């Protein structure tokens, strides 16, 4: 994964997408293959689901303060995501879906990451909410130059917003530029051929930079 690159991982449920992300952040063992990561790389992670005990008194502000490795640049980026929103004093369990995703994104940015991992980060959001969230992601990518590695079931987003697509089904079925993957037999076997009419939720310009993470058979 190169700086500034947007790579999207697709595949059916149970294909290993979330497990791959957990392996990257070190919370799941690697069954085979290896992940090669630069020793200095910083990773931010937005999980698919945040499991919080609803009886636990935890405000959004307190939740953000629990991050230990934050830095000044990360704090600035997190503040830009949150803006002047007044829900920081709200209990995490009471936040709307869109508010929670902003808080999770802000938390992932506190260490000013080189690579941002998004595990179905717009799950549960409606189309306007998803579009607003992806716009924030693009703003972060443009301002920081970080790479974005995301899992998504929204094939419109995948085909319009990614520099590269990796299709998993227990192994790498196919990978490459979006249109190349969309026309591959392996992809069509999984998702069908109805990929016309995709739309861009945001625009992006990819700049080639030094690779930060290499993935090999994991």
Regions found by a protein language model. Give the residues of each.
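Hydrophobic anchor residue at the start of the ABC signature
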Residues: 105
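H-loop/switch region of ABC-family ATPase nucleotide-binding domains
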Residues: 152-153
């Amino acid at each position: 994964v190169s700086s500034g690159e947007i790579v999207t991982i697709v595949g059916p449920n149970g294909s290993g997408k979330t497990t791959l992300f957990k392996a990257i952040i070190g919370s799941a063992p690697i069954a085979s293959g290896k992940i090669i990561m630069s020793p200095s790389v910083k990773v931010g992670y937005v999980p698919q689901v945040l499991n919080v005990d609803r009886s636990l008194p935890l405000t959004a502000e307190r939740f953000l303060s629990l991050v230990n490795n934050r830095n000044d640049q990360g704090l600035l980026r997190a503040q830009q995501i949150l803006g002047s929103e007044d829900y920081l004093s709200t209990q995490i369990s009471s936040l709307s879906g869109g508010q929670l995703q902003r808080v999770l994104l802000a938390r992932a940015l506190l260490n000013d990451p080189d690579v941002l991992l998004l595990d179905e980060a717009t799950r549960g959001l409606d189309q306007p909410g998803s579009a607003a969230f992806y716009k924030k992601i693009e703003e972060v990518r443009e301002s920081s130059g970080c790479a974005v590695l995301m899992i998504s079931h929204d094939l419109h987003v995948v085909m319009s917003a990614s520099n590269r697509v990796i299709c998993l089904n227990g192994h790498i079925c196919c990978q490459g530029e979006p249109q190349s993957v969309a026309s591959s037999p392996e992809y069509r076997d999984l998702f069908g051929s109805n990929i016309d009419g995709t739309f861009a939720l945001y625009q992006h310009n990819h700049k080639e930079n030094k690779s930060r993470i290499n993935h090999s058979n994991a």
